[in-house]
């Protein structure tokens, strides 16, 4: 039977994906591979899309039709007007007048490793995903990474408490995507209502250089932890 989408232990029935015939003509025409170098090498682009979409050429074509953010995309342009909320205590939120951080301030002029996950205090996220980056922070910094960022569809106060519990705030910057707009823009939103989580994020990781996505990995299921950990991204930098 299907596994629980976050813990991998309980039965879970995933909501059906849209069939290609249900896509709008505009969506079918979008090409997620935007940088000239990748676009000029269709086999490389297709391989990247296949990895992004689950491995098969058919899945890769479907990914392209749906307009997934992918290698070569500009992550800031893909989510215009979107800001994230840095993890902090309530008092810090009040003191900063509940300020948010524009994506350009996070990515422009920097080498960033960012990973997204379904939510704070959930199983794989707490036991494997965050620790993989915390434990490899020195190796990431040695490769010239300016910041390692964890983002989830949570408020910044929950993320702050979780980060402190994991003793990960010194290594990783945590940001909330309060209304899910960042993940919606990248087509990384998933409905996890069956796990009482509502609409959340897929489990994913990316290496972003000055806003341009250089490597992009998305798990097939939120309970998986095979391609989005620090060990994988280290080999892609």
Give the predicted meaning of each segment:
Residues 39-237:
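Chalcogenol-based redox active-site neighborhoods
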């Amino acid at each position: 039977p299907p596994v629980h989408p976050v813990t991998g232990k309980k039965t879970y029935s995933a909501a059906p994906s849209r069939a290609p015939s249900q896509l709008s003509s505009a969506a079918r025409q979008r090409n997620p591979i935007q940088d000239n170098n990748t676009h000029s090498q269709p086999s490389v682009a297709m391989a990247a899309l296949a990895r992004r979409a689950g491995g098969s050429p058919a899945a890769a074509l479907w990914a392209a039709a749906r307009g997934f953010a992918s290698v070569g995309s500009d992550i800031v342009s893909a989510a215009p007007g979107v800001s994230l909320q840095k993890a902090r205590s309530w008092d810090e939120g009040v003191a900063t007048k509940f300020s948010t951080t524009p994506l350009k301030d996070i990515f422009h002029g920097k080498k960033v490793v960012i990973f997204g996950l379904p939510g704070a205090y959930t199983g794989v996220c707490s036991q494997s995903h965050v620790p993989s980056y915390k434990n490899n922070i020195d190796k990431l910094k040695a490769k010239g990474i300016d910041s390692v960022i964890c983002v989830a569809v949570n408020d910044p106060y929950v993320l702050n408490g979780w980060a402190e519990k994991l003793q990960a705030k010194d290594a990783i910057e945590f940001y909330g995507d309060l209304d899910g707009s960042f993940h919606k823009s990248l087509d990384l939103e998933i409905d996890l209502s069956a796990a009482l989580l509502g609409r959340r994020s897929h489990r994913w990781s990316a290496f972003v250089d000055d806003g341009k996505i250089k490597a992009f990995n998305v798990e097939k299921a939120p309970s998986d932890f095979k391609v989005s950990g620090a060990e994988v991204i280290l080999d892609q930098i």
